[in-house]
Structures are given as structure tokens and as C-alpha cells.
Curated annotation (Swiss-Prot):
Tetramer of two alpha and two beta chains. This is Tryptophan synthase alpha chain. HAMAP family: Trp_synth_alpha. GO terms for cellular component: cytosol. The alpha subunit is responsible for the aldol cleavage of indoleglycerol phosphate to indole and glyceraldehyde 3-phosphate. One of its GO terms (molecular function) is tryptophan synthase activity. InterPro entries: Aldolase_TIM, RibuloseP-bd_barrel, Trp_synthase_alpha_AS, Trp_synthase_suA. Belongs to the TrpA family. The lineage of its organism: Bacteria, Bacillati, Bacillota, Bacilli, Bacillales. It catalyses: (1S,2R)-1-C-(indol-3-yl)glycerol 3-phosphate + L-serine = D-glyceraldehyde 3-phosphate + L-tryptophan + H2O. It is an enzyme of class 4 (lyase). Pathway: Amino-acid biosynthesis; L-tryptophan biosynthesis; L-tryptophan from chorismate: step 5/5. Keywords: Amino-acid biosynthesis, Aromatic amino acid biosynthesis, Lyase, Tryptophan biosynthesis. CDD domains: Tryptophan_synthase_alpha.
Length: 267
């Protein structure tokens, strides 16, 4: 299980990529680039054919990965390959619950341990149904990451009391995707979560530029960035796949990712 021990001036930068997008070997290089860009941890998404929480950018990434033959087992194994190839930040598997159910639970957790996967995030599993999975995570030393969206304070307290690693604070209702601005009600909500939580609070769903990062960093411990990075991968995909242009495209991706991280001011 991992703990994110932050220095007072340090902020979380937790990027999301889809395992196998655009191709598995490039996913490994993208993870290394994100680590160099200052990522605190990595969310590794499992491609799924019916991604309820995801907007069009991540849906297209899922399709590209599924076209490569990716599934939950291969995604976990890809996480293991990342660890073997120099990725030493925590890797959190982001998966819908159905692919987990289709595997034997014992086999699923054995795979996570064998491949040194540090955390698990299941976006479509409500609090009431997550207790047994949280217990399994504890017994296998995998950190279960809790998602919180605007809800009653008593429910918030219940979710946050059980939180480990960090609390993933959902900035907008609806699906993932780049947003130009957020509803003003999100800011008091994030402050409430921050006041209740004893673990770091990261804000995600829609973070797409440096200005939003600065704003969210003022009231939280950092950000989760998904669609903006996945869209950049989509834009660079042909150059990432080609051996001749890959290094240059990876550098471009790393420079882009750095704008979301604490390393930005060091450039």
C-alpha cells in the first residue's frame, strides 16, 4: 500500500493514460515520460467497451487499445512491464467493475501483486457495494482509491473516513473530458472535502490547462489529468508508433505534460 507524503509546497500531479494506447510498447514509454515530467503517481486505465464515466476522448483511446487486443489481464501485465522498465512511481489501475467480476478475485489480486500494481480505482462501484473489495485490497496490500462527487456531508464523511492514498475529488458531474470552466459550486465542495480528509485531495474530471491547475492547487493537494493528456496522445499517435519519430514525439508529450506538474516552474 502506498502513502503520498507531500512536502508543504509540493502538489500532486496524477496523470491518466489508457493501457495499450496507441500501442502497448508506447504506453511504457509514455509512462516513463510522465514520470520525468513530475508525475506523483500514474492512473493506468483498462480499456472497456462500455465506459460510462468517460467522454469521447477516452472512449476513442479505449477503442484503440481494444483494437490492439488489450484486456484487463494485459493491462495489469503492462503495468508490470512499466515497473520493470524504470517506472517507480505508484501505478493505480483504473478499471470498471465488470472486467474485475469476470476474473476470479484471487487471480485478479495475484496479478496485481505479481505486477507490482500499487492501487485500484473503480469508478462505477458505489460506496455501499465497495466494502468487500476494499477489504480484499487491504489484505493484498493494494491501496483502494475513493472517488467523491458533490453529495450530502454525512455521505462525504463516510467515504473520506475510509480513504487511502488520496481522495479523488470529482470536479464536475457527468463524464470525463476537457472543460473550459467549472461550475462555481465546485470550489466550496473541494474545500469541504479538504477539511474532512486526512489524506491528500486530488481534483480531476476536466483539468485541461495550467491556469486550472494553479486554481485547483490553491484549494486542494493537486490534480488528476486524463482527457487532456489522452487527447495529446491521440494527436501524436502516428509519430509515437513510428520508430523514426517516436523520441521526438515523446519529448513533445513530456513537455506538454510538464505544464500540469510541479516541475513546470523549474523549466
Amino acid at each position: 500500500m502506498f502513502k503520498l507524503d507531500l512536502q508543504p509546497t509540493e502538489k500532486l500531479f496524477i496523470p491518466f493514460i489508457t493501457a495499450g494506447d496507441p500501442v502497448p510498447e508506447v504506453s511504457i514509454e509514455l509512462a516513463k515520460s510522465l514520470q520525468k515530467a513530475g508525475a506523483t503517481a500514474l492512473e493506468l486505465g483498462v480499456a472497456y467497451s462500455d465506459p460510462l464515466a468517460d467522454g469521447p476522448v477516452i472512449q476513442r483511446a479505449s477503442k484503440r487499445a481494444l483494437d490492439q487486443g488489450m484486456n484487463i489481464v494485459k493491462a495489469i501485465e503492462l503495468g508490470g512491464e512499466m515497473k520493470k522498465n524504470g517506472v517507480n512511481i505508484p501505478i493505480i489501475l483504473f478499471t470498471y467493475y465488470n472486467p474485475v467480476l469476470q476474473l476470479n478475485k484471487e487471480y485478479f489480486f495475484a496479478l496485481l501483486q505479481e505486477n507490482h500494481i500499487d492501487g485500484l480505482l473503480v469508478p462505477d462501484l458505489p460506496l455501499e457495494e465497495s466494502n468487500s473489495l476494499q477489504e480484499e485490497c487491504k489484505s493484498h496490500e493494494v491501496t483502494y482509491i475513493s472517488l467523491v462527487a458533490p453529495t450530502s456531508e454525512s455521505r462525504l464523511k463516510t467515504i473520506i473516513e475510509q480513504a487511502e492514498g488520496f481522495v479523488y475529488c470529482v470536479s464536475s458531474l457527468g463524464v470525463t473530458g476537457v472543460r473550459n470552466e467549472f461550475n462555481s459550486s465546485v470550489y466550496p465542495f473541494i474545500r469541504t472535502v479538504k477539511n474532512l480528509s486526512t489524506v491528500p485531495v486530488a481534483v480531476g474530471f476536466g483539468i485541461s490547462n495550467r491556469e486550472q491547475v494553479i486554481k485547483m492547487n490553491e484549494i486542494s493537494d493537486g490534480v488528476v489529468v486524463g482527457s487532456a493528456l489522452v487527447r495529446k496522445i491521440e494527436e501524436l499517435k502516428d509519430r509515437l508508433i513510428s520508430a523514426e519519430t517516436r523520441n521526438q514525439a515523446l519529448q513533445e508529450f513530456e513537455d506538454y505534460a510538464m505544464a500540469f506538474s510541479g516541475l513546470y516552474s523549474l523549466k
